[in-house]
């Protein structure tokens, strides 16, 4: 087979891989967003679901009155995403320590650390510097997008609206959206609590980069966790169900963008069986997003 034919096959394979990747990781979320918009935002399903948990006689959401439920599902639940972000920051800082020690490898401190557990941790941090910074940036962008949408749509929570004893009018987000300026004082769309759990999707992309065989299970667990976080707030009257879906969509898309910038599509699309041979994160460098050579290797 001549070189022109080989190159044509490589181009076809690369194009097919690219379409498959974006079809799954971008096309499916966009389709789901349209489905949520049509099913929830253009209908009264949100209110019908929320009505199930509202005591119209007492004028309250009974579960929302439980301090224990609030502590377990809202305050304590934030520990997992908060610790993940904090550990990423600590890891990113520590990733610069070992390279500094290597410059003074003849020092007493460097010799002591070389065979110690602390030295092992520092070398681990150096190897995964790119991953730590990815998690930090992914968390920052997804959180920033959620806060931007909250302030630029000014949607009030169910308990704050006249539908459930509050004083504010219930207005859908797309009727209130303002691109450049804050739309008002409402801060309920998308769901912030659910988004904190969905922010852990950054860990899925790290796992996918290393072709971890359980990455799909990790993805399912994170999505389930986000749904649980969001649903508990629905039970308390602080969110509609669609707010949780939108939070997941926004966080997924923003995290996907950061993952593409840090790792590149070809790294995120590698078959599981190539895990050991491909990724060696020894430096804080980004990989080209659509490397033809990488596509050809992963296809082979």
Residue ranges and their predicted role:
Residues 2-115, 153, 180:
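N-terminal transmembrane-helix/juxtamembrane module of multi-pass inner/ER membrane proteins
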Residues 35, 39, 89, 93, ...:
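Alpha-helical membrane-inserting segments
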Residues 77, 134-138, 142, 146, ...:
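Alpha-helical transmembrane segments in multi-pass membrane proteins
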Residues 104-152, 215, 219:
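Interfacial segments of alpha-helical transmembrane regions
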């Amino acid at each position: 087979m001549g070189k022109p034919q080989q190159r044509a096959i490589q181009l076809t394979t690369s194009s097919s891989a690219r379409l498959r990747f974006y079809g799954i990781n971008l096309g499916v979320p966009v389709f789901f967003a349209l489905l949520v918009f049509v099913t929830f935002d253009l209908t009264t399903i949100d209110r019908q679901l929320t009505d199930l948990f509202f005591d119209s006689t007492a004028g309250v959401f009974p579960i929302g009155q439980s301090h224990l439920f609030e502590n377990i599902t809202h305050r304590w639940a934030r520990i997992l995403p908060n610790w993940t972000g904090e550990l990423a920051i600590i890891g990113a800082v520590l990733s610069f320590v070992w390279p500094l020690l290597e410059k003074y490898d003849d020092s007493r401190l460097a010799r002591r650390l070389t065979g110690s557990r602390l030295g092992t941790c520092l070398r681990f941090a150096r190897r995964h510097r790119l991953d730590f910074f990815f998690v930090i940036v992914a968390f920052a962008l997804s959180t920033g997008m959620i806060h931007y949408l909250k302030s630029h749509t000014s949607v009030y929570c169910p308990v704050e609206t006249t539908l459930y004893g509050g004083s504010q009018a219930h207005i859908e987000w797309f009727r209130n959206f303002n691109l450049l300026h804050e739309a008002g004082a409402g801060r309920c769309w998308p769901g912030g609590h659910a988004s904190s759990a969905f922010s852990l999707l950054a860990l899925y992309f790290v796992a996918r980069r290393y072709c971890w065989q359980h990455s799909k299970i990790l993805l399912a667990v994170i999505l389930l966790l986000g749904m649980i976080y969001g649903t508990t707030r629905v039970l308390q009257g602080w969110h509609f169900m669609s707010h949780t879906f939108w939070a997941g969509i926004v966080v997924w898309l923003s995290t996907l963008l950061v993952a593409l910038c840090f790792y590149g599509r070809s790294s995120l699309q590698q078959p599981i069986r190539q895990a050991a041979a491909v990724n060696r994160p020894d430096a804080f460098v980004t990989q080209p997003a659509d490397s033809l050579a990488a596509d050809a290797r992963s296809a082979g």
